[in-house]
Amino acid sequence: LTLKLHNRISEIGESAWNGLRDDDNPFTSFAYLDALEATACVDQASGWQPVHLSLSDEAGVIRGVMPLYVKYHSMGEYVFDQSWAQAYEQAGGDYYPKLQGAIPFTPVTGARLISPDPAVRQALAKAAMSLCDSNKLSSLHITFPREDEWKMMGEMGMLQRQDQQFWWGNNGYSSFDDFLAQLSSNRRKVIRRERRDVQSRLDLRWFVGSEITETHLGQMYAFIESTYDRKWGSPYLTRAFFSRIRETMRDQLALVFAYEGDQAVAGAINFSGGDTLYGRQGGTLIDVPFLHFEVCYYQAIDFAI
């Protein structure tokens, strides 16, 4: 197998990249990763320098790919290793740059070693390890991999780390009330009261696929900016990124808005892939009790059902 490094995913190509995937996870798709690069969300200036790997056979056919980045900081990973960086540097080393196998700004489990062939997946991991040695990078981090990848890399000698996420599963529910029926009486009452309080003041509306306009995206970005202004600073994703994915991933987008009269005041952006709905980002321009839960959780559960 022949190893190549790519500073842009476009060098690999959409058909070659997507042809190796075995699921509909939107975040490992060519369109999503290409949009990050095309709209300057990831580049050397942002501290996420793409160095994607590909492995090709003797005929030049690409058999495996890996989303990979040289990182100059630890922001946007949703795994907090700053204490490692501090300890590493106190010991006399330079923690940055490091090598990161990840989907930028996206703490969603998915393939990081993309190939239908287990031997090629192992070869991708070995190639990434070798890059650290040959380029004087401190370490390799592969975050939010699938369980089979996690186990394989552990068997290869990589240190394993576990964390916890909360996922909601649709156990064949026919309606939101059917879901509530599985909860305790007290919890049902609380959720119904929370939803009633929000819906008595605001109107909730969904827009999917071709229904989504640039106006919707502008409103949604204002909500996202509001969240970042209060908590972290500037958003990682640019406004241009959302226009790009509206063009290339339209059928996988689902936006929910809360309206006060004719004015959109809150919302959340969701991605669909296969049998899964991924709630990603959102925000609000007003302070309404339980609005976050309605927009980001209850509406998404209802939509998924």
Predicted feature locations:
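A conserved beta-strand-loop-helix scaffold within acyl/acetyltransferase catalytic domains
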Residues: 1-88, 129-133, 138-290
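Conserved acyl-donor/pantetheine-binding loop and adjacent beta-alpha core of acyl/acetyltransferases
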Residues: 69-114
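Residues forming well-ordered secondary-structure scaffolds
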Residues: 108, 119-127, 135, 148
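A short, internal acetyl-CoA/4′-phosphopantetheine-binding micro-motif in the GNAT/acyltransferase core
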Residues: 108-119, 282-290
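Conserved acetyl-CoA-binding loop-helix of GNAT-fold acetyltransferases
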Residues: 118-130, 288-302
